[in-house]
Amino acid sequence: MARRMSMYSMASEAMGGPQAPQQMSTTTLLNAIHNIYLSSQPYQIDAGTSLVVNTWLTAAQAGATVDATLAARAWEHARRRAEDGCVVLGSLHQATPSLLVPFLNTFPFAIPASIYKSLEAVQPFLRCVTPYNASAPRQIALGVTLTLSLGGSVTGASLALSQGGIDTENGLLNVPAEAGYRAFDVFYYLLTSASTPAEREFLGLKAPSAYALLARSGTYEPPSYLITADDGAAADDFRQALKEIGIKGSVHRNFISTLAGLLKLGNTLDYDADSDDFEEICEDVSGLLGMEPEVLMQQLSTEDRRTLVAGLYEALVDWVISKANAAIAAQMLRIRDGDESVDGRGVRTPNENEDGDTVSITVVEVPEPALGRALAMRTIFDDTLGINAEMIEDGVEIHPASSSVVREMQQAVADVAPDLGIMTGPQGRDRQHDIEKREVILEKAAYASEEDSFLKKLLFPVEGQGINLGRTGRFDLPGLLSSSRAWFHLALHPTDDSPANLATLPAITSAWSAGTISRQLRSWRLPEWANRRNRSLDYTADFDVDEFVGRYGALGCKDGKDGIETWMLERGWSNGEVFIGKERIWVREGPWWEAESMLDIKPAHSLQSIGQNPFTSGFDTSYSANPPNGSGFFPAPAMDNSMNGSNDQLMHTRNFSQGNMSQATFNQHPHLNPQSAPSIAPSAMRNAQPATGDYGLGNKGDTYKGQVFYNDDGDFTGKLDGDLAKDKKIETKPLTFGRRAWVAFVWALTFWIPSPLLKFVGRMRRPDVRMAWREKLVLFFIILLLNGLIIFWIIGFGKLLCPNANKAWNVKEVAGHAEDEDAFWVAIFGKVYDITDFWRQQHSDTSIKTTKTNMLPLAGMVMDNYFMPPLNRACRGLGIKETVQLTFNETITNPLAQHVSGFYTRDRTSALHNADWFWTTFQPKIKEYYHGDLVWKEGTVKSQGSGSEQHPWVMYGNQIYDLTDYLHTLDVNDNFDTYKFLNEDMVNLWKNSPGTNIKKDLDLLISNAKNETVAANLKNSWQCIQNIAYKGIVDFRDSPRCRVNNWLLLAFAIIICIVTAVKFLAALQFGSKRRPSPQDKFVICQVPVYTEGEDSLRKALDSLTALQYDNKRKLICVICDGVVVGEGNDRPTPKIVLDILGVDPKVDPPALPFKSVGNSAEQLNYGKVYSGLYEFEGNVVPYIVVVKVGKESEQTKSKPGNRGKRDSQILLMSFLNRVHHRAPMSPLELEMFHQVNNIIGVDPELYEYLLMIDADTCVEEDALNRLVAACAHDAKIAGICGETALENDEKTWWTMIQVYEYFISHHLAKAFESLFGSVTCLPGCFTMYRLRSVDKGKPLIISDGVIKDYSVCDVDTLHKKNLLSLGEDRYLTTLMTKYFPEMSYKFIPDAQCKTAAPESWSVLLSQRRRWINSTIHNLVELMQLKELCGFCCFSMRFVVFIDLTGTIILPSTTVYIGYLIYVLATGTGPIPYISLAMIGAVYGHQALIFILKRQWQHIGWMIIYILAFPIYSFILPLYSFWNQDNFSWGNTRIVIGEKGDKQVVAVDDEGFDPRSIPLQRWDDYAMANNLPGRRGGYQEKTDYSYGDNYELDEIKSVYSAGPQGSVLTGMPGRNTYMPPSPAFNNGRTSTMGFQESPMQHRQSMMSMGTGVHDMRSQSPYQDYPGQHPGVANLRGQANLSPAAGGGHSRSGTALGFSSGSRSPMPDAMRSQSSFDFQHGQGGPTDMAIVESIRSVLCEVDLDTVTKKQVRALVEQRLQTELVGERRTFMDRQIDHELENM
């Protein structure tokens, strides 16, 4: 049982405030009330009743007065006694403000944030403005039920109205017709401008005066005395609250429609309503409510409609409450799963098993004084009911109340009998009649509504139960009181004056009327109440005899009543304090709490006898302020009022705090928490051995024996054997619809591959591995299919659409081969021939020789006239003589090439003399060289026919014929009949329709021949024309079918070219390199370390130390991912790191637990924390090192503590998240906080940026300042990266091919994405994130959502593996873009770093596999985001799509480039000018970039890159795609099947118990260990600013010898406190102060790995280098008594000195041991700076000089560069001097 001292226990006797005397009178009580009113305190008239006095003014300005002690008392009783409690918030005056929320805030546990949001959503339905109360509740009673575990933490919560419902009569139907009254607030919120214009138009809303329900009083605005009250602002908050409880979208539309319908229906409640208006209103309302208008107009009377309005309104409120309860339940589920903290801020580690027994506390607000009076008086004065009757029956002597009191009680109960469930009297019968009538009317409305309408769901919330209004979701108020222990919190009002008058009073407590208070006291009979309770009834606990003995037996109580009585006498309790009844033991509050306190301080091992008592279960460690017995991992407090609080005991318990915390941590002592979750890592590994100089890490891996090796990626080379479900715990997890659909799709494609084949042949024994292989196969197939489709689309699809496109050539294309001896093309009678292989042959049989001179002029010509056959052979059947030949219209330019055959052949010996030479010799030979058709554009044909020369060209279908030479011959020969051999009618078609398609006319002419002779003539003429006039075909390539593919390709080509051009322009940043001014933001430099070597680590740490940035404002945070020996190393990596940093090897900090990213039991991990100062080249920088060492059970494994880089990032992110939210922390995080806050001396909350680098990265000196300056200039930047170059660029061929890729990927891709503020991959090797937004301090990289998604433990699918195991850095960027799309993610090339590239093929292959696969899976995630900036095709969504497809189709790109090379080399197709231009543009732009940037070396790198293009674009992608499932699959959680919507998982370990990692808030931990640096409240700050009263010199670093303050020097004279931040108990004052003690320093100070001694002795900056004080010396100095004046400030150091001393050490000692971390070796004084500024301003021209120039001149004059506060002072002083000139 985890025992601890409750906050309540500290002041249990004091009751937390003034108490009632034994005998009370009205005057006495009146005086007491006046006193508590002036002091804003509660007054307890008995142990269970408190009185408070509040007005709206005190509540608004000073905070409502509430009794936190009563809340704590109710909580303690509930959890310790396992009994339900009920706190009644009664109001004795109609003007008292509501105390529901303030009272909830006083509970000593965190209230779920969703409860407050739910109340925000519900209260506008219940509150009204009245002349006496600006927010008067109109409900009968509203209850907030908090379900608690027996440990006292919240496990559930809900809201409910009592069965009495809401006073709709005064709040809606019949608002008093007096000024100052309003209806329910929700209606005014509906009508404000918060409603969108679309909503207002849809609802038809008007001004409030247009609605009868709102117009009765004529008051439409909030009271004027509330200067901040505004319905518009409140409506915005209300709408947001509705959204947060799930009322949004269509549900919200239905909700506001119903609300508007009720408002409009109110206009029909007047009996004299106009009939036309009445019908119009009913039509409108029926549309809004979704019911038939006839029901409203005809079936319901006016009185019925009044009942309908009231009933629907209550049903709507019940529905809103049900939605609120669902939202609360959802948050509680997330809290139980550890996804969220109770207050909704920060991630949470569950620390309690919340599945056990529970109790509940119900806080009931009863705003009506009459009902509250009746409830209270019946509880106190009625001896026939409840606990009073039980006590009387058990023998407790109770003095009866006076008859007058009894009569008043009976009359009070009778007045409100129906609300108390008493239905026997006249009022009850009337109420019952009204309820029955309401049910009939509501049932009629429900059945008249549309099926599945919102109205029907409102009225029938439970299917099959009919109208249940007033019962479903409501609570029985009398029943609740009778079944719970009742506590009363009663609120009085000091005056009857109107609230407006209170605002004019001189003080908030000036309002007082003794008569008013007296009337309230007498009305409720409070004096008699106090006297009766204190005399007879004030027993707050009761037990049966066995239960009492069982609980307190460990304290010496013996069995039986006699044993109890004896024990009572030993304790000094009288019979009045503890009464032994017939059956039960009755105990008053004082004795009961005294006994409980003794149980708390009793050692746990002596309480085993009550170990099974349900009332003694473990408590939630996240609450405790002072765990007295070292509960869990937390040590005992130094302040202990128990018998164990001696000095010896004090020293003993303090030694648990840090250096010796392991004793408490690992249950070394038998009295520590036997019921808490057992530690999985016993202490043996930590503390069994003395310090041996190994940093407490052991000697594992120190000797290089070759047992454990890791490759360059840190992958263990050993083998793992997986077991399946045998002897394992089987779990089922629900699957998302997307996952189920994907699994079904995978199986549909791979069903033909039997699983046994994969299992036995493929050696995939596990189902999850086989499933991943199937997924990989499907993805690989899809990618190959996509690549194939791309290639087919570019190369083959066009040919499929346009089959002969590559065999068609126009005259221009043919002419393009003129004078081309290697591509000799000619066109003859509409055909194109490639006679390249023929023209050189000696093919002439005459004296004419075939020479180049003769032949080349003919290349590219159309040679129809050179090969005209004899007409008598070409036009048979037309009676043409052999002497007839055509006269050509065009002159033959090369007569030697004319082939005239037949009669006119010049050489009779030639083969041309044969009249059939054209058909027998020429055509068979020329066909061998056929290359395609000669094509003409249709426009060319038409222009030839319609031009000035009007050539007779016509189309016959797609064929083209030209009769120009025939008609020209007739013209030359005067139409001599010998030459008129063609049919006249046919020739007329050419003459009359030139340029047109005559197919239809010609076919008609032939078919309509008069006789056979004419038909024969026509056919012969047509045959003749086909032989001598054929010109080619219409260019079909211009058809849509052939053009569409080219246009699509061209469109994409244009888009890609535009994107390329924009990328090029984005990369052009001319001008000199900017030199931003020095920045002063606090930055954490995170370095995750795994298996890197000493050289790489030293370079990385040295580069961070040497950064040109204020050393005090940067913190190096090294996180070692396990105790791992890297390849080539002779010791584990953590030891290498600690050696480099100079940590004393004898330092052995404890291993502390924290939650890791891992499967099941791997979530429990342990880590050690070291801190100190690291010096390099004169720079001294603080560092903190966290070494993950793992559990005890891991020490025999190869990599204890290793959980991956993602876990290292999450460790720091989660820590900063909890720092931001001030949430409970794990022990490791508490130690980190202590080291940073108290040892280093900087509040972790001051850090604003997180710089992430890899351990093999060297950062340029100005890089960090440039990154911070960019973020300071643009507050929207959430993440930013710089340029990463290679430091080993010339090491091997494999590094050389990467140089150009690194350069161009930054200056093109990232520069382009940065234009949109959406860099899709911020590399983990060099990226900086902003921790919080500037305006509101909203967490960014440390937000709950990012951490939750990034810390997913169950990485059991292929997609998750590629996201979270390969591409952590890219996925982190994806998550940031997902959760903060409105923020920017930038790249700046001026910030540079260098990293080492893979030097071997195997490592490069492994790296690119991770990069490519993670890129694909991350970009798929990015494509699902809804909000990415940009517009049209320049949206980042489009660019992401281009990047995604570009990565996937890399192989097809390589294939296509190969195809282009083939086409160009062989000339087998048209030259692809566009493709060549695109390739030229891409590489041309890239070349221009580095030429313009004068990066000449990249010319050579570019050539090497192009040579390696097939490797990057073909080999690496295909290898990566196929190896998507190449992971190490752990054996802890094995997915053995996915069936339906479930995933079956076999778990093979002890599991993870969240209780093994207890949580505690820093303030509680600091108080328990007397540590400085307590922070105050826990609520999230509303603005990320610290106010004027906050100085950074509140915490003093142990490394500093400067004046009191932090490392920032600050103002020594100031001594302000931490920024006030309201906590959940904001209204309460502390019961004790805190003062630093001389004993505050503990031995653990120097054992925490701080490295103080080592670093100080090495520092070149100490004044006396020869003197090296040892640790003992420092400790001795630490124990010096503080100087006089030690006060209550938090500002002391971790060494334990009082803040009253300006220095922790005497002046003589300062320089001996401390480097002045604030000032270095000094600097210019304020006066020197002022004098320099004045001198400079006197010398410069004030009209032209800039402030930056003045600053530079001042620094030049001072011969130093001012940073931090000194720079701020200089800037402020420059402004001051300029103002005074």
Curated annotation (Swiss-Prot):
Give the molecular function GO annotations: ATP binding; chitin synthase activity; cytoskeletal motor activity
Q: Which UniProt keywords apply?
A: Cell membrane, Glycoprotein, Glycosyltransferase, Membrane, Motor protein, Myosin, Transferase, Transmembrane, Transmembrane helix, Virulence
Region annotated Disordered sits at 1677-1712
Residues modified by carbohydrate are 133, 534, 629, 644, 655, 660, 889, 1011, 1413, 1526
CDD domains (alphabetical) = Chitin_synth_C
**What is this enzyme's catalytic activity, as reactions?**
[(1->4)-N-acetyl-beta-D-glucosaminyl](n) + UDP-N-acetyl-alpha-D-glucosamine = [(1->4)-N-acetyl-beta-D-glucosaminyl](n+1) + UDP + H(+)
Annotated organism of origin: Gibberella zeae (strain ATCC MYA-4620 / CBS 123657 / FGSC 9075 / NRRL 31084 / PH-1)
What is the name of the protein in this document?
Answer: Chitin synthase 7
**Enzyme class, spelled out:** transferase
* Alphabetical list of SUPFAM superfamilies matching this protein: Cytochrome b5-like heme/steroid binding domain, DEK C-terminal domain, Nucleotide-diphospho-sugar transferases, P-loop containing nucleoside triphosphate hydrolases
Q: List the disulfide bonds.
A: none
Query: What SMART domains does the entry give?
Result: MYSc
What is one GO biological process annotated to this record? chitin biosynthetic process
Query: What cellular-component terms does GO give this entry?
Result: cell septum; myosin complex; plasma membrane
Residue ranges annotated for the DEK-C domain, each copy included: 1723-1779
Q: What induces it?
A: Exhibits higher expression levels in hyphae than in germinating conidia. Expression is increased in the absence of chitin synthase CHS2.
Locate the compositionally biased regions of type Polar residues: 1690-1702
Taxonomic lineage from the root: Eukaryota, Fungi, Dikarya, Ascomycota, Pezizomycotina
The UniProt entry's sequence similarity note says: Belongs to the chitin synthase family. Class V subfamily.
Mode of membrane association: Multi-pass membrane protein
